[in-house]
Regions:
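Generic beta-structure capping elements
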Residues: 101-104, 192, 215
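Charged, glycine-rich active-site and insertion segments that engage polyanionic ligands
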Residues: 1-67, 75, 185-187, 194-376
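Structural recognition of the conserved hydrophobic beta-strand(s) that form the central parallel beta-sheet
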Residues: 159-163, 176, 187-194
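Clamp-loader machinery-focused feature within the broader ASCE/P-loop NTPase space
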Residues: 2-171
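Conserved catalytic/switch belt of AAA+ P-loop NTPases
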Residues: 148-151, 174-188
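Short secondary-structure boundary/capping segments
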Residues: 88-90, 181, 201
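Conserved amphipathic alpha-helical interaction elements at protein-protein interfaces in regulatory
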Residues: 70, 152, 181-182, 376
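Residues immediately C-terminal
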Residues: 167-168, 182, 198
Length: 376
């Protein structure tokens, strides 16, 4: 297995996030930061890794954290050694110089962007309490609990990682401001956010953002092609197909790989055929429901439907579809759903998500969605 494939999905051991190979588009930034440390220039007190999922920002932060704490980093600028006492503490999730909020983001429990993207495309797993929005919330008491570690900790470097920083309550953000305004020697804060626009301006103005978001198209294409082994569903993949994946993933290479590996991605044309059959009355909603229950979980079918709905809306607005490989424009040439029906079906998808969190049976949810799809 090559390094790229390992980065995309083979990080099964919880400790591998700290020691995974550096992603190609992160090498320049890594060299800049490590060189700064090795030349006795301290890093900024607070750093923000921000951007959409699938860019590898969490993988970068955890790798940098491991390297900063590694006892051998002075002689190994390429990454943490993985064998010293500090690295062993990281592997066990018991490093005395590292604090993580929320606790479910600790790598012993949660994975990097790479694994988050893969998990979203793996066979459906029901959401657990540990990954719910409430579990990701950072409260004021959580920030206050960090104060002894920050202000009264022992000698040496101490690191705090605040993942999903946009989930901080206003009170928590205000409590964090004091720490940002009064930096302590040898204390480093790393904030990670998928939606930095939701961070308070006062927080963003006091942190330095890492340059993680710029990925050259050629680099992304090369990475995704190699990561997929030049195939999708065992079929040779063209450059055009890779470019479409990257476009659908908004330029995020890891998200593009996860998209290609998602069970529903290869069933987009089948969804279109089912919709046309339902709309024309050639197939009943019950029969369609029974069929699709054997193909995808309801969660995967919703993801598929959301993707298809986006392109249907684009075509109805006179825009080009993003999926050029399934003849969607041709299918809509003779019929286009009106805006109200599109809105109703979109609402049904969201309502089904909520219902599933309340333990509604998948069969019931599938039956209802097929009835709605027939009316689209």
């Amino acid at each position: 297995m090559n390094d790229l494939t390992a980065n995309v999905g083979a990080q099964e051991r919880s400790d591998s996030i700290y020691f995974a190979p550096l992603l190609p588009w992160q090498q320049t930034l890594w060299s800049q930061l490590t060189q700064r440390v090795l030349t006795q220039q301290s890093l900024p007190h607070a750093l923000l890794a921000a951007g959409m999922q699938g860019m590898g920002k969490r993988a970068f932060v955890w790798r940098l954290v491991a390297w900063l704490l590694c006892r051998e980093h002075d002689t190994n600028p390429l990454g943490p050694c993985g064998t010293c006492e500090s690295c062993q503490w990281l592997k066990s999730g018991t490093h005395p110089s590292l604090q993580v909020l929320p606790i479910v983001s600790m790598p012993i429990n949660a994975d990097s962007d790479t694994l988050q993207d893969k998990s979203s495309s793996a066979k459906d797993k029901k959401a657990t309490k540990s990954t719910s929005n409430s579990a990701l919330k950072i409260k004021v008491d959580d920030i206050r609990a960090l104060q002894p570690f920050i202000y009264q900790g022992g000698q040496g470097m101490r690191i705090c990682v605040l993942d999903h920083a946009e989930q901080m309550t206003v009170a928590a953000a205000n409590a964090l401001l004091k720490t940002l305004e009064e930096p302590q020697a040898q204390v480093h804060l790393f904030l990670i956010s998928d939606t930095p626009a939701q961070l308070l301006p006062t927080i963003k103005s006091r942190v330095q953002q890492l340059a993680l978001q710029t990925i050259e198209p050629a680099v992304a294409i090369d990475y995704v092609t190699k990561a997929l082994g030049h195939t999708i569903n065992r079929e040779a993949v063209s450059k055009m197909a890779i470019e479409q994946l990257i476009q659908l993933a908004n330029g995020a290479p890891l998200a593009a790989v996860a998209l290609a590996q998602a069970p529903w991605y290869s069933k987009r044309a089948l969804w279109l055929t089912t919709w046309q059959a339902l709309r024309s009355g050639k197939r009943s909603s019950v029969a369609a429901s029974d069929y699709w229950q054997k193909q995808l979980s309801i969660k995967e079918f919703i993801q598929l439907s959301e993707r298809m709905l986006l392109d249907i809306k684009r075509i109805c607005l006179g825009l080009n579809e993003l999926q050029t490989d399934i003849n969607l424009s041709e299918a809509l040439a003779s019929y286009q759903p009106d805006a109200l029906n599109l809105e109703v079906f979109g609402d049904s998808l969201q309502q089904t998500k909520v219902a599933l969190q309340q333990n509604v049976q998948e069969k019931f949810a599938y039956d209802k969605l097929m009835q709605e799809l027939a009316c689209l």
